[in-house]
UniProtKB/Swiss-Prot annotation:
The keyword DNA-binding does not apply. HAMAP family: Trigger_factor_Tig. One of its GO terms (cellular component) is cytoplasm. This is Trigger factor. It comes from Lactiplantibacillus plantarum (strain ATCC BAA-793 / NCIMB 8826 / WCFS1). One of its GO terms (molecular function) is peptidyl-prolyl cis-trans isomerase activity. The lineage of its organism: Bacteria, Bacillati, Bacillota, Bacilli, Lactobacillales. Residues 163-248 form the PPIase FKBP-type domain. The gene is tig. It catalyses: [protein]-peptidylproline (omega=180) = [protein]-peptidylproline (omega=0). PROSITE patterns: FKBP_PPIASE.
Length: 440
């Protein structure tokens, strides 16, 4: 089949291709078989009219449009392969000629992937983050674990302070009327947690068990319930209990309580230091990767990104995000209700960086091509095994869902990222070079 690609302005071009006699005949045969099922012709049972009679009555041309619809998808795909173009959107296809006894000629306006001209992407200069673990880092983590092990004990006839927890009943009113969601009983609220309406917690500092009080607040302008935005409200509050945190002693017993693999506080400190070191090194690697990748993208020349590519990216991000929520037992409807957002809000959230994500992927694909990165069958097999383990699937199910080309593409992209990051020249911050502080 003859196919010709002519690049036009921007990311568009014209794809001219033919559908040959054999395919046309095949399409007409299938179109006739579909058409005759519902055809009533005098002298013949329904659906039994011969082809010759049909042609005499209606002409073979009456089947052309249906035949075209049948053979066009395959013909278009073959034309794409022949011309080696990469469409990113649905084409606009028009019939150029459809004459009996001749190949059908079609012209398609096609939007293709933007061209990428790579700049420097290897040996880029990046900043290495400080990965030292200091005594203060270990102390902060120990304090965090103490907070998690804290017990709430009743404060007898003592006023509530910030950091204390009050157990309250409350009922809210706007313009003298109660509102939906504004009432609760035996609600535990940590003062200073900023988990309630701004100003609410501050007005409970100083209350005691048994107190009844009123709290006056103004709902934020961006409050999730639109009917309450910027509204003044009064809450009637009854205080049942005031509790304060009692932190455990920082000793060997505490260490054994928070980590069954250690016997002493010193062992816990050493383990925390190792964990923090691993976290910092992982974060530093990610930062180098991000900085190097951003430079590689900035150094490249990339044609304008088609809207279709940005939309595809946005919907992929949304699907992945909602799938992750689903794995946590939160379906999309529940997610939107809990967050007070809509599908449009989520779309806008991912739209903000869609163009950058698409550009990054285009640059990585260009690096894969420039470096001739081709994952081996062993690497593909290992990827299948990892995915099967990650998603608790059979390897055969992974193979059924993903082709080798798809798996190879994902592996190659990751290898391109590694190449860019690993070749980068890492420079320590000036203050890190001078820093001779306690490394614990």
């Amino acid at each position: 089949m003859a196919a010709k690609w002519e690049k036009k302005e921007g990311n568009q071009g014209e794809l001219t291709f033919e559908i040959g006699a054999d395919k046309i005949s095949e399409g007409i045969d299938k179109a006739f078989q579909r058409t005759k099922k519902n055809l009533n012709v005098p002298g013949f049972r329904k659906g039994k009219v011969p082809r010759q009679i049909f042609n005499q009555m209606y002409g073979e041309e009456a089947l052309y449009q249906d035949a075209l619809n049948i053979v066009l998808p395959e013909a278009y795909e073959e034309a794409i392969k022949e011309t080696e173009i990469e469409p990113v959107d649905q084409p606009q296809i028009d019939v150029d000629s459809m004459e009996k006894g001749k190949p059908w000629v079609l012209k398609a306006v096609v939007t293709v992937k933007p061209e990428v001209k790579l700049g420097q992407y290897k040996e880029l200069s990046v900043t290495r983050q400080n990965t030292r673990v200091y005594a203060k880092d270990v102390d902060a983590e120990l304090e965090s674990r103490r907070e998690k092990q804290a017990e709430l004990v009743l404060k007898e006839d003592q006023p509530a302070a910030k950091g204390d927890t009050v157990v309250i009943d409350f009922k809210g009113f706007v313009d003298g009327e109660p509102f939906e969601g504004g009432e609760s009983e035996n609600y535990s609220l940590e003062l200073g947690s900023n988990s309630f309406i701004p100003g609410f917690e501050d007005q409970l500092v100083g209350v005691k068990a048994g107190d009844e009080t009123e709290v006056k607040v103004t709902f934020p302008k961006d409050y999730q319930a639109e009917d309450l935005q910027d509204k003044e409200a009064t809450f009637k509050v009854t205080v049942h209990e005031v509790k304060t945190k009692e932190l455990p002693e920082l000793d060997d017993e505490f260490a054994k309580d928070v980590d069954e693999d250690v016997d002493t506080l010193e062992e816990l400190k050493a383990k925390i230091k190792d964990e923090l070191k691993e976290q910092k090194e992982s974060a530093a690697h990610d930062a180098i990767e991000d900085e190097a990748l951003n430079q590689a993208v900035d150094n490249a020349e990339i044609q304008a990104i088609p809207d279709a590519m940005k939309e595809d990216d946005i919907h992929r991000q949304m699907d992945q995000y909602l799938a992750n929520m689903q794995q946590q037992g939160i379906d999309p409807k529940t997610y939107y209700k809990l967050t007070g957002t809509t599908e449009d809000d989520l779309h806008k959230q991912f739209a903000a960086d869609a163009e950058r994500r698409v550009k990054t992927n285009l640059v990585l694909e260009a690096v894969v091509e420039a470096e001739n990165i081709k994952p081996s069958q062993d690497e593909i097999a290992a990827e299948v095994k990892d995915l099967a383990s990650q998603y608790n699937m059979e390897e055969s199910a992974v193979r059924g869902a993903l082709t080798d080309d798809m798996l190879s593409h994902d592996i190659a992209i990751r290898q391109a990222v590694d190449l860019i990051a690993d070749s980068a020249k890492q420079n320590a911050k000036a203050e890190d070079k001078k820093d001779d502080s306690d490394k614990n």
